[in-house]
Amino acid sequence: MQMLDLLIKNGRVIDPESHTDAQRHIGVTNGKISVIEEIWGSKLQGIQEIDATGLIVSPGFIDLHSHGQDIENYRIQAMDGVTTALELEIGTADVDEWYDIRKNKTPINYGVSSGHIPARISVMEVGFSLIPSKDAAHRSAKEAELKNILETIRVGLKRGGLAVGFGLQYTPAASRIEIIEAFKIAKEFSAPCHVHIRGMGNPPDKGNKLGAIESIQEVIANATITGAALHIVHISSVGLSVTEDLLEIVENANLNGLDITTECYPYSAGMTLIESAIFDEGWQ
């Protein structure tokens, strides 16, 4: 019998693609899985052997929404089984620089979106911030500014951005037309739109802030108009009373031919920066 380079023994193998959830031996040859075998009666042997009794063996997890994009966080994620960490919500206005900083330095895979928020900040504000708190949040873009914002997004996709990222709750002054135009660019590059919607709660907040249902209707309409794929960046904990309604809206949109996904974070509360537009007057 051929000696394997690596034998992972007795682990609970979970593979969503094949619907496998069972105790198995896994053999690796030349860096690739060469055999998966039931443990009973197995005679597999490896040059290196790992006893994974009581542990789960699975494909690496892909985290679509990871703001911890530094070496320390990558190491922690690797220990949690994450093999790819992507910053697809906020993203960056300079894809080349973002990738250059991490090249050949990380223990896991990484990727970034061409971000609407940082594009707005780069065009409309002086200096850098993760979340806008001045003009990029609270002022409509002038014609020339909008042209530059959209060009920044387009260049980011040309340079390897994996998606177009939006944080609409953080840029309440961004017009519906501005967002539709950015969706059009995503469609042009066959890139998905990863969108933190304008409002998360229900019923709608006081003033001009939208609730979760109205906000999801907006981005689904954008996807319908442009044909862009859409990922709704979480069904939020502050909209628990309408969670079933939101999921039904997404499901029915997909049944009608759209390409929409969503997720939720595994906590009962969210977090953000106190200077963000979420805490504008009337936020309570």
Per-segment meaning from a language model:
Residues 146, 155-216:
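Divalent metal-binding pocket/active-site signature
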Residues 67-69, 90-91, 115-119, 169-171, ...:
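Active-site beta-loop-alpha junctions enriched in small/polar residues
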Residues 52, 56, 72-165, 192, ...:
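Divalent-metal coordination cores built from histidine and acidic residues
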Residues 74, 95, 175-178, 203-220, ...:
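Histidine/acidic-residue-rich catalytic or RNA/ligand-binding cores of hydrolases
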Residues 102, 106, 118, 125-130, ...:
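Polyanionic/metal-chelating signatures
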Residues 1-7, 12-59:
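Histidine-rich, glycine-flanked metal-binding segment
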Residues 11, 31, 54, 65, ...:
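Divalent metal-coordination and catalytic microenvironments
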